[in-house]
Amino acid sequence: MGSISNRKIEKPEHHMVLQVAKEMLELNPNEGIVYYKGEPFSGLGVANYSNGQMAEEITYLRGKRNGLLKRWFENGELSFEAFYENNRLDGKVSSWWINGHLRSESNYKKGVVHGLQKQRYSSGRPFKELNIVNGKEEGLQRAWRENGDLFVNYEAKNGRIFGLNRANLCYELEGENIVTDE
C-alpha cells in the first residue's frame, strides 16, 4: 500500500489535537466550513464502523479541510487517501480496491485536476491513463480492456481529439476465420 508523504501543514495553535467524532461536526454548506459547538473546528474528525474499526479521519483547520484525509474498508485495508490545503485537494489522491490493489491515482493542483491520472481494474491491470492540464485533457489519453487490449488511444490538443476513441470490434477472430453473430 502507498501512502502520501509528509507535508508541512499549518496546525491548530494548541499542542493537543482535538479529536471529535464526525457525527458531532456540523457542515455549513453555504460557507464550506465545519463547526463544532458553534465554532469553526480545528482538529481531527474521525468516524468508525459499528465494529469499532476506523472508517475515516480528516484534519481540519479553522473549519476547513487542511491535511490528510484517509478512509478504510471495514476490514481495515486503506481505501482512499488525499491531501487537502485550505479546503481544496492538492497533490496526489489515491484509492484502492478491497483486495489491496491500487484502484486510482489522480493529481490535483489547488483543487483542479492536473497531471497524469491512472485507473486500474481490480485485477491490478491498467484501465486508463489520462493526461490533464489545468482540468482539461491535453496529450496522450489511453484506455485498455481488462484483457490488455487498447481500446482508446488518442491525443488531445487544444480541445480537439486526434486518434482512436472507443474502438469496438464488430466481429471476433478465431484462428483465421471471421465469426459473426448469426
Predicted regions and their residues:
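Glycine/tyrosine- and acidic-biased, solvent-exposed loop/turn segments at the edges of beta-strands
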Residues: M1-E182
